[in-house]
């Protein structure tokens, strides 16, 4: 799993739930709080020069959010007359997005403050603009400060971002006011291991049986940088594994970047999502400029606003306190809620540091070293967080057993709520979302062969593997049900109704051995592997779709 890693002060972790008040009555607060003062071990270099270019993404509020939440509940309930009546993007804009007048008021304000290239997303939930440190200070009543952070140059806002009170109910957050999240690229691999798998091995291990390939379903991968080599690797994997060549479309989000440091991550995503599915109608690769919160938020918003794919996978994350404080959590949660109402699902890696949250660069796959906190976006209510197991198969390739992978992320969200579908089985909290929702093979010691830079290598794993595997399973299920399953949360939890009775046929292997630090595997839902791992054929028979 690719992580956004950074060092934060104790104040950042302990004060995460606090909201900051407006500096003056003429201003209204947004969800973007002060980041600069909370950065530990950062050397203040003074104010960011006024002329420094700054790109911002201004996130807007969903209107009538409670009604939209209720709508999602209705369309995922087989007993409700609205069951299966998912929204189209135009329906969302007409019923739940900010009005054209509200959007124009923000656009006009940004232009009046010197911002250029002001562009509104089709769903009216985000406005991108280019400005300077000076225009940021004037428009959002906050100073950008320069820092030396872990040997790198960074900047962050010294105070909460605010907007004029006339836009207080319109603007949710101002993203792009910091770049303090530092990307680490640890390789989740071990030396050659005899139990390594290829995509088709998982069809047998996880009992695809007669469940059809995902050939009728479009899926998406969330990536960063130049993915041309990733597509070349995918073609080699398909050719050498005897798989069909899936149609690939790259959607550039923001400025193109030449970065290829995440190629192993995106190779895992593409090869093992489409490989697990056996085929898909289209594989969309959303390629953003960087994995800063601001750029990722724009990418997630694209996914919802366009509704090109039924589901997607994100093999990256960040300690959830950071997106809460910089406001991107609210922006992303809005995108995920829209996606759920439109019948779309996002799967996300739960992390590779066990029950602890990585707040500094460390050795991948080793729990500890950070606060007991979960990764975002896996912790988002409307995202399916995917944990990890160690998979053991029989000599014929069939399923033998699994135990919890000790480094798989899990725990309780301090900021996002447990969804109505999870609440009945989440005995660990009456409020916070439990992570993960499901799990798949992730241990690099039971990992996979990967085509990387034109050659097949071994052995890769992490929740960067389990998330795209889950996406591939879901593509099969969607195709089997004519793409009518909608948002996966309720369907998956309803498919696990036999848990915790081992005698009851369910759609999941209930993992009851192992742990990830603070948490231990238990019968039923737990904070190590969620509901468990997929038995695809049984789950296909257990879930229902609208007629």
Please provide the spans of the model-predicted regions.
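N-terminal secretory signal peptides that target proteins for export/translocation
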Residues: 1-6
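Bacterial N-terminal signal peptides
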Residues: 9-20
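Substrate-binding/charge-relay-adjacent region of secreted/lumenal peptidase catalytic domains
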Residues: 25-123, 128-388, 412-462, 467, ...
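Short clusters of hydrophobic/aromatic residues that line enzyme substrate/ligand-binding pockets
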Residues: 377, 405, 420-421, 450, ...
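An often Trp-containing, charged/polar helix-loop segment at the C-terminal end
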Residues: 390, 425, 471-474, 478-527, ...
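Short acidic, Gly/Pro-enriched loop/turn segments at secondary-structure junctions
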Residues: 392-399
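Extended ligand-binding clefts on enzyme/binding-domain cores
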Residues: 400, 404, 412-414
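Acidic, glycine-rich loop-and-strand cores that form catalytic or ligand-binding grooves
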Residues: 411-414, 418-420, 496-504
């Amino acid at each position: 799993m690719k992580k956004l890693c950074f060092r934060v002060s104790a104040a950042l972790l302990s004060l995460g739930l606090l909201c900051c008040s407006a500096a003056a009555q003429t201003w209204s607060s947004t969800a973007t709080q002060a980041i600069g003062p909370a950065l530990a071990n950062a050397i203040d270099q003074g104010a960011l020069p006024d002329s420094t270019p700054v790109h911002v993404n201004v996130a807007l509020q969903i209107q009538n959010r409670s009604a939209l939440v209720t709508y999602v509940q209705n369309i995922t309930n087989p007993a409700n007359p609205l069951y299966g009546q998912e929204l189209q993007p135009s329906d969302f804009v007409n019923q739940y997005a900010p009005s054209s007048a509200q959007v124009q008021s923000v656009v006009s304000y940004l232009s009046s403050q010197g911002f250029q290239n002001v562009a509104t997303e089709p769903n009216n939930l985000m406005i991108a603009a280019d400005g300077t440190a000076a225009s940021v200070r004037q428009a959002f009543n906050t100073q950008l400060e320069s820092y030396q952070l872990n040997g790198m140059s960074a900047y962050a806002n010294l105070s909460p971002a605010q907007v004029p009170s006339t836009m207080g109910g319109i603007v949710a957050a101002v993203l792009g006011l910091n770049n303090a999240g530092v990307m680490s690229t640890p390789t989740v691999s071990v030396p050659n291991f005899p139990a390594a798998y290829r995509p088709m091995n998982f069809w047998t291990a996880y009992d695809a049986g007669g469940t059809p390939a995902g050939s009728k379903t479009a899926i998406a991968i969330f990536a960063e940088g130049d993915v041309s080599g990733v597509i070349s690797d995918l073609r080699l994997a398909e050719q050498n594994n005897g798989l069909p060549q899936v149609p690939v479309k790259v959607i550039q989000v923001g400025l193109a970047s030449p970065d290829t440091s995440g190629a192993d991550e995106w190779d895992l995503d593409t090869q093992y999502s489409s490989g697990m599915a056996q085929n898909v109608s289209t594989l969309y690769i959303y390629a953003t400029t960087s994995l800063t919160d601001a750029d990722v938020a724009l990418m997630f918003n694209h996914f919802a606003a366009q509704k090109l794919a039924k589901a997607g996978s994100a093999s990256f994350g960040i300690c959830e306190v950071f997106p809460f404080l910089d406001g991107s959590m609210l922006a992303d949660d809005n995108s995920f809620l829209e996606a759920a109402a439109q019948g779309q699902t996002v799967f996300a890696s739960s992390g590779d540091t066990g029950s602890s949250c990585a707040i500094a660069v460390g050795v991948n796959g080793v729990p500890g070293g950070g606060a007991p906190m979960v990764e975002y976006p896996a912790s988002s209510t409307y995202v399916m967080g995917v944990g990890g197991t160690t998979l053991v198969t029989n000599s014929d390739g069939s399923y033998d057993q699994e135990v919890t992978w000790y480094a798989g992320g899990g725990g309780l969200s301090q900021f996002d709520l447990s969804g109505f579908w999870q609440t009945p089985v989440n005995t660990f909290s009456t409020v916070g979302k439990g992570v993960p929702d499901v799990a798949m093979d992730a241990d690099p010691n039971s990992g996979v062969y990967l085509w990387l830079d034109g050659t097949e290598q071994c052995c890769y794993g992490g929740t960067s593997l389990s998330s795209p595997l889950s996406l591939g399973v879901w593509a099969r299920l969607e195709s089997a049900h004519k793409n009518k399953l909608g948002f996966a949360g309720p369907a998956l939890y309803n498919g696990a109704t036999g848990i915790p009775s081992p005698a009851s046929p369910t759609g999941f292997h209930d993992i009851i051995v192992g742990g990830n630090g603070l948490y231990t595997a238990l019968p039923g839902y737990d904070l190590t592997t969620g509901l468990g791992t997929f038995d695809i054929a049984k789950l296909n028979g257990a879930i229902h779709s609208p007629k």
